[in-house]
Structures are given as structure tokens and as C-alpha cells.
Amino acid sequence: MNVTSFRSWKRTAVAATAAALVTALTVAPAPASASPAVASYATTINGDSADVYYPVTGTRLPVALFLQGANVDKSNYSTYAATLASYGFVVAVPNHTRSLFGTSGLFPEGAQAGWTVDWAEAEDDNPASPLHKRIDENTLVLSGHSFGAATALSLSTGLCIIPFCSIANTAPGELEAVVTYGGNYILSGTSIALPVLNTVPVGYIQGLADGVATPDEGLSTYNLTTGTPKAFISVTGTNHYGVTNGQNPAGAAPDTSAQTLDQAVGVETIARWSAQWLLAQTGSSAARKYVYTTGDAADPNVTVTYVK
């Protein structure tokens, strides 16, 4: 969960499950190029169990660390992660357990970025790894959901702070871009948006049906994001769990706002725009054209606001 949804997580009683989904009538077209096959394997990153998704072909692949929502198991992001990997990323999705305000659970923290850089270097050097000599060790990008999104935003400033880190620490020099879903920088228990003094590009993907991290909160955070490039990419019909394999994963605070876009369409849309944003910020001219020119017009479910 993000800063705002942390107050929801702290409740001991949770609301009933969300209303039934309504299947969307429109499906956004995929980019013209065919996606490569993707494989996966289990590993550990600094002691955390992690799933790694990667294209079966290609070299010098940048690493994308995915920071989970609070108490959302990594398995719930398998479709999103595999889709993101199909665009040419090594996607690492760890389960990170720690104690936060006296409660133990799945809570990501900024130190994971540095751990992932170390893991990537070791994996690239490991002859037994399927990623041996295939990783771009100099490029790290972040994707995050909810609390993981807020953690990624904290890292985007160059200095991760509590509660998004156990202790304050700096972002690794390899970090080049951030994309979030269902994230904001609203001060817990208030409607006050804190400024994001980012030093790397940040893209906010926002479900317009999100009842946990609302569109107004996301837009307020975007408006107070000082560094550029930045983008606010709204997705019609997705709620807080539009990025997961299914609605309201077990253990996580539910979103009672109903999603109206088909779940599979929502996940594909969020993953595609995540990939295109990250590629655009790491040197792809085709992705820049997609993000800033053609993608919005081609996707009936998405509206993009940006500052280059």
C-alpha cells in the first residue's frame, strides 16, 4: 500500500469484497512488434525469496525491480511481471518481510534496490545462471504498487526515508527511471500531498476506479513532482488491484471500488505502459514516440499527461 492506503491497512476490520466486475467492451491494441517468449525461475535476493522473469533471447537486458504492495504476495504479480519482461527486462519480484510500526508483514523497503544491483552483478557472472552474461549491470529501473510505489517514489529522490526504509539510505547510482501503479505521496491520515523531489524520471499509472489510492491523490502527487520527465497515465476502469492477477489478493487491504475494465486487459495495459515509459527513459526512440505521441491515441482506455 502507499502512504494513503497505510491507514486502511492498519484497520483490524476490513470491508466486504468488491462488487462484481463488468467486462470492458474495448481492448487496447498491443504494440506492433511481437513480444518474445518469457521464462522464469526462483531465486533469493539478499535472503528474500524472489521470482525472476526474463526474455528467453537477448543480451544486455536492464533489470526492473518490482516493489510489492503491503501484504501482497509476489505470486499475485506474475502476469504483470511476465508481460513487462517481454519488452526486454529482467524483472525481479521479491517477497520482503519486515516489521513496520510493530507489525510484521510483506513491506518493501528502499534497500532492496541496492541488493538487487548486487544480485544482478553476481547473476551476470554466474555460469550456471540462465542470465549469465545477459544482464546490463549498469541499468536499474523500478516499478512499484501501492506501498511499493511510495517506496519507489522515495528512492526516486536519491534518498530513501522511513517508513520506506528501515534506515535512511541512498539510491544506487544505477537507478535510471521509476514507474508506479496505485501510488502517491500523501501524508498518512491527511489529504496533504508531499513534494517528490525526484532526480530520475517518474511515471505515475493511475486507475481511475481506484478507491484506495484515489485519482485526486495521484494527480496531486504528480503536480508536486519537481523533476522531469514525468507523466501521469490514467487507466479508465481499473481499481487498486488492476495490476494483480485477480481482485483483492488474500492478506491485503481490499478495494471496495469495483473495477469495470476486464482484469486481463487491465494488467496488460498497465504492464505495457510501464514498459514503454521505462524504455522511453532509457534510450528507446520508439518508446518515446509511443509515450509522447501515438500510444494515447491508440489506446481507448488511457489518457496521458506529461512534462518532458
Predicted regions and their residues:
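N-terminal cap/lid segment of alpha/beta-hydrolase-fold proteins
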Residues: A32-R60
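Short beta-strand element of the alpha/beta-hydrolase
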Residues: R60-G69
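Gly/Ser-rich "nucleophile elbow"/oxyanion-hole loop immediately N-terminal to the catalytic nucleophile
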Residues: G105-A150, G158-I162, A287
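The feature captures the conserved acid-bearing segment of alpha/beta-hydrolase catalytic domains
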Residues: I167-H240
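Alpha/beta-hydrolase-fold serine-hydrolase catalytic core, especially in secreted/extracellular enzymes
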Residues: G237, G246-K308
